[in-house]
Regions:
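Active-site glycine-rich loops that stabilize anionic/oxyanionic intermediates
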Residues: 12, 20-23, 86
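Serine-hydrolase catalytic-loop signature spanning alpha/beta hydrolases and amidase-signature enzymes
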Residues: 20-30, 41
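Active-site loop/oxyanion-hole signature of alpha/beta-hydrolase fold enzymes
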Residues: 30-33, 42-83
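Gly/Ala-rich beta-loop-alpha elbow adjacent to hydrolase catalytic centers
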Residues: 84-88, 92
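Flexible "cap/lid" loop of the alpha/beta hydrolase fold
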Residues: 93-98, 103-134, 138
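Conserved alpha/beta-hydrolase catalytic His-Asp/Glu region
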Residues: 116-122, 133-189
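Short beta-strand/loop motif that positions the catalytic acidic residue
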Residues: 191, 197-199, 203
Length: 203
């Protein structure tokens, strides 16, 4: 099993927060500060991201899913609340399909049931092409701007930029391949957990 960084703060029922494309556990700092008084907050850095940036990245959602489930099992976390953002939302959907009995409640935040979502600001292939043309830093900045109504002026924009800078070109491209090739529509019916879907009206 790969060794990845997993933040672990607070006490109580575990709350697992899974970041998305060009993210890291740092993005959850405001949530950690709030929720650690009520939950044991678990924040993994996915392979190739954040403090796991020396770990080989994956190019499919299923393998990341399996890794996270294995890591949680190793930490003896067998019942938890689960939230995923964007690509992380794809991962948590697969976690719920595979190990739904371990998940108390599920939150899908700014995500969908397939990687190539209609209405995305650009196709995944365009994202891959822009990554190659513009490089990681500009791509990370452009992606992070889409996460906030205020764009670069948002309070936590800089945290997101720093997270993106810790990623390699290979990891970023592998993640885009994983997103493009993932489609969970046909297996949505396998999610039996009580689920909250959070989708901003300007997303």
């Amino acid at each position: 099993m790969q060794d990845i960084y997993i933040g672990d703060e607070g006490k109580g029922i575990p709350l697992v927060l899974v970041h998305g494309f060009l993210g890291s556990s740092r993005m959850w700092e405001p949530q950690i500060d709030f929720f650690k008084d009520y939950f044991r907050v678990i924040t993994p850095d996915l392979p190739g991201y954040g403090k796991s940036n020396q770990t080989k990245s994956h190019n499919n959602i299923q393998s990341i899913t399996n890794l996270l489930l294995d890591c949680l099992e190793e930490k003896k976390i067998d019942k938890f609340y689960l939230l995923g953002h964007s690509m992380g939302g794809m991962i948590v959907q697969e976690m719920a399909k595979k190990s739904g009995d371990k998940i108390s409640k599920l939150v899908c935040y700014s995500t969908g049931p397939r990687g190539e979502m209609p209405g995305r600001f650009e196709t995944v292939d365009q994202s891959r092409e822009n990554l190659k043309k513009k490089g990681l830093e500009i791509t990370a900045k452009n992606i992070a701007k889409t996460w906030f109504i205020k764009g670069e002026d948002a309070k936590y924009f800089d945290i997101c930029i720093e997270a993106g800078k810790q990623t390699s070109m290979e990891t970023a491209d592998n993640s885009l391949v994983a997103i493009k090739n993932w489609n969970g529509v046909d297996t949505l019916k396998n999610i039996k957990n009580e689920t909250l879907i959070v989708w901003g009206d300007q997303d």
